[in-house]
């Protein structure tokens, strides 16, 4: 059994305060989930986050982690930014949604969404209705995503083998 219902992690820095927006929406919907949040090394607990913590008792917040695999494995579902963490969720077969912080992340988000591996919420700071729809679907267990073997965690080994082949010839 998973320890948390939802893990939220937005990388090293939440430049657009997306976490505050997500927590506000969770609060608006009066959603009862066991939450875990990884702030990232450069993200601080803002007054809005602290206020949410006082009202919501099923929440664990950590500043950072050295074991993302353990954190992702302990949850049923995730929300993350469109960077490296998307590959970690995919490798561990944990369904997730992507919120984009920067333009370059939209490509990854669209690709995961097209393959039905993740939900692409895009730039929620521009259209927060997407997070409302997503949270409703999550609470009603209406999110069905493919479990993919697309990412197996062995890419660096394959690359190093190819480099060694090139060096030997």
Report residues per predicted region.
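Nucleotide-activated sugar donor-binding and catalytic core shared by glycosyltransferases
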Residues: 1-169
């Amino acid at each position: 059994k998973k320890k948390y219902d939802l893990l939220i992690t937005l990388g090293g820095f939440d430049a657009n305060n997306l976490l505050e927006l997500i927590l506000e929406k969770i609060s608006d919907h009066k959603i009862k989930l066991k939450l875990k949040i990884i702030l990232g090394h450069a993200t601080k607990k803002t007054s809005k986050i602290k206020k949410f913590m006082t009202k919501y008792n099923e929440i664990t917040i950590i500043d950072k982690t050295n074991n993302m695999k353990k954190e992702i494995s302990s949850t049923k579902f995730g929300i993350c930014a469109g960077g490296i963490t998307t590959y970690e969720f995919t490798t561990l077969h944990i369904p997730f949604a992507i919120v984009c912080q920067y333009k370059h992340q939209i490509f990854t988000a669209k690709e995961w969404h097209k393959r039905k591996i993740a939900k692409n919420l895009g730039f929620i700071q521009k259209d927060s209705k997407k997070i409302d729809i997503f949270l409703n679907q999550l609470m009603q267990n209406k999110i069905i995503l493919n479990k993919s073997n697309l990412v197996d965690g062995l890419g660096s080994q394959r690359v190093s083998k190819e480099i060694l082949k090139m060096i030997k010839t």
